[in-house]
Amino acid sequence: MKTGKANAVARAEQARAAGFVAPHTSPNPVDDATAPTWAQSGDRVTTAQGLRIDDADNSLKAGVRGPTLMDDFHLREKITHFDHERIPERIVHARGAAAHGIFEATDGLEDICAAAFLRRGAMSPSFTRFSTVAGSRGSADTARDVRGFATKFYTAEGNFDLVGNNIPVFFIQDGLKFPDFVHSVKPEPDREIPQAASAHDTFWDFVSLQPESTHMLMWVMSDRAIPRSYATMEGFGVHTFRLSNAKGETSLVKWHWKPTAGIHSLVWQESQKLGGIDPDYHRRDLHARIATGGFPQYELGVQVMPDTPDQTFEGIDLLDPTKLVPEELCPVRPVGTLTLNRNPDNFFAETEQVAFHPGHLVPGIAITDDPLLQARLFSYLDTQISRLGGPNFSQIPINRPLAPVNDNNRDGISQHAVHVGTTPYTPNSLGGGCPFARPDGTAYTHPPVAMERNATKIKLRPASFDDHYSQATLFYRSLSPIEQLHVAQAFSFELGKCVSPGIQARMIANLGNVDADLADTVAAHLGTTAPAGKVVDPDVVSEALSQTRPQDPIVSGRMVAILADEDTTAKLVNAYRTAADPLGVEVIVIGPHFGKLASGLPIDRSAHISDPVEYDGVVLATEPDEVTTTFVQEAFRHHKTIGVADSAMAEALNLPVNAAGVTLTPADFFEALGRHRHWNR
């Protein structure tokens, strides 16, 4: 019998024989050049102090069967570190996935913004984190929820963080209500349920008493809250920001991210099933797209509005975070392209420890007096200190700027820098006057903004904040009939989970001020009636708010299932693969078992572990049986593209022969796949 030491030696020899030394990957572009390049080096197990260990399998004991000895310093060090490996999760946005990328200012904003990274042709490394809001770290990706969309730009002038969501508005107008909102949507404190879900009494109790939430609720109950992929999800800065150019001229802007792959969502049944079948669905999808070279891309744009004294545009208060500016009134101006091209090397070190903050600004970009944004400036900085163990979180590699740092900050928990000199203060003479501040055109300058004349301290909101329903109506009326149906079904589902009938009644009354038909539909589902409301009909509708509007037929990153059996020919499967490869579509062959089919065709997945909700389209490459018929029919119910051999096979599957999205050839199949869903059948 080999001893633990002999086993360790054997494993080491096997590793060296295989040419393996250490799991080194590409260095993080923001690593400090003076720090060790790798977290691990060499091929021997050591302690944290670099001491080589002769046996990593057995504790030190008094005899072979004796008690473990406390003088086993390696055991104590290893267990102690293990006991402290977890840090507090984010209070919100705990569940997330991220990727490195590169941002190129293809169009530039020099005329309105002095930021160097927004000059035409400038390129900046970046790190983007997507997330859900309500759920814990271990919750499912596909829950109905707002999605975070936060990007850190490592620019020559310092880090700039664009900390947004996939919805352009928010639930509340003032940051004072943020803890109340979060407490309401989190699991109820007596039972700690439900997880990652808003379908419960406390959430709807809060929002039904906060009419300002109504616009946001329309978005969250829409398909926007169940995206197909992070790569097919819009992003928004939510708030209004102030840009200034080299001349000091200012503009007000709203940030937009437009995915080049289009804007697409799951359907509700898919979202629910995927939560059990693959709770890591979005995380897995993002990683796979990047690993296979199908890099997600987003166009950054801004809506540019004049910086007027009242900070309004076309009657819309730009300081109200529950309001948007329709793109038909103010088109989005292209700025540049973000390409996510590298997966993190380590989830904890990068995705978990990245610290975003809306106050991480660069010259030319400033915040406004939006009361929710003002509170976020405090909250984001404060929470990092708790979550990351102290004030030195900016020294963590993923958070380090590329720009030189000389901030006079010293000491504190987890101080990684070794500061030299004796003058961590400004001004000084002993250090030659360094570091010093100088307004030389390269430093950050707050744009001068006139304050309200004779302003008094007061706890009030402007009257323009009182309109809580008109934009909710605008959003709902801008949706297609199928999207409106989904909104009504989502409200019915969520409110149906509430125990208190008073909550349901209040929310139905609120919906009556948005759209009478919507309120009546939800009320009927709940077995009640809706009171008459006061609906303000919008002057226009916004086509940009609908996901079913015509979009470019991009299919890159989609997954297609080919259902095969022993009678399936490799020729048929290869015909679909040949058509799919140049389009960036992944084809998965699903068979009755693992291994190969009689034709020698490899099987990627077994039918026993596959479900149609995982795929964007389905091809039946064999005669239908009970399993494949159920598979195809469910995909059809979800309005997906279906490929069959002929009309007889479609009839055998009980599918309408001439239904939209039911195709007979690879060419027709992939053309139909570009429409994402076929809502007209």
Regions found by a protein language model. Give the residues of each.
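Active-site-adjacent core segments of small-molecule enzymes
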Residues: 2-567, 574-582, 586, 591-609, ...
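Catalytic nucleophile loop
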Residues: 500, 617-622, 630-654
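Structural alpha-beta junctions
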Residues: 581-588, 637-641, 657-658
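Short secondary-structure capping/turn micro-motifs that flank functional sites
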Residues: 595-597, 627, 651-652
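A short helix-to-beta-strand connector/capping loop
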Residues: 601, 657-661
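A short, aliphatic-rich alpha-helical micro-motif
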Residues: 612-613
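A charged, well-structured terminal subsegment
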Residues: 660-681
